[in-house]
Amino acid sequence: MFQLYRLSCAIVFVLAFAGFAFGQELVTVTRQDQQTVSLSVYETGKVSCRGVAIISPGAGGSEKGYSYLAEGMSAQGYLAIVVGHKESGREAVRQQLRGNGLREGLSQLITDPAAYEGRFMDIAAAKKWSRERCNSPASILLGHSMGAATAMIEAGAKNNLGLTGLNTFDLYVTLSPQGVGPIFSVNAWQAISKPVLIITGTRDNELGGGSWKTRLDPFNNMPPGCKWLGVIDSATHMNFAGHGISRRTELLTVQTIQAFLLSQQQTGCRPPMRERGIEIQTK
């Protein structure tokens, strides 16, 4: 049985993370198939590193995006890394759109097993490189849209693409995750045992116009054990990527992630204080 909570934005937290990232650095690493991977690295300004937070963008995204997430994680003491995924980045989307409409082109890309295999290699290369910069073994995988699907598969979600995740991160944060559909079938998330935070919005509609409520499927299907679901009032899909009038969504997202991380240090993974603008369910 889960509990329902409502959240409102805290100005103190806004001041705590806005512009706090110690520094951004562009790095190129090599993955296991010898292809190069572009990373945006946000060092923490704190004395000790709490762990690595790897951010996987949505289809068409790049290592240059999601700065609000990276800065938020850096402010909390994590080495934050935004990963560029060549097989599903901007150029890959452009190629898919040639001769296809937007919906069909993106649908083909986000259901391409090879694109996910490339993502897993990118993430593994970023994680390996991070060991030289952070002496803490703790690790978090965050993903938006296709990056959320990547994180769910890595966490152990069964899928229709024939992919198997290694479940190597300590916890997962997924923004705009997919529900039952082309990627995931019914009961796909039953085996996920690690802590998971899901965040979506009431205007975060699926590709093709499907209701945002399909994004609740993973939470409803996962077993209890430090699973959180946050729903932000009026947040759109692209707000989570930092586009549009997104500041409010960004602040609530980072604030909720902070509360989720703090809950890991408490007995029972206790939920946050009630705030305006977001509803939190836990189980």
Where are these regions (language model features)?
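Bacterial N-terminal signal peptides that target proteins for export
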Residues: 1-9
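Bacterial N-terminal signal peptides
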Residues: 8-18
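Boundary at the C-terminal end of the N-terminal hydrophobic targeting segment
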Residues: 21-23
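Serine-hydrolase catalytic machinery in alpha/beta-hydrolase-like enzymes
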Residues: 29-135
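Glycine-rich His-Gly loop
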Residues: 55-59, 145, 201
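Primarily recognizes the serine-hydrolase "nucleophile elbow" in alpha/beta-hydrolase
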Residues: 126-191
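The feature captures the conserved acid-bearing segment of alpha/beta-hydrolase catalytic domains
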Residues: 164-234
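Alpha/beta-hydrolase-fold serine-hydrolase catalytic core, especially in secreted/extracellular enzymes
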Residues: 234-235, 242-283
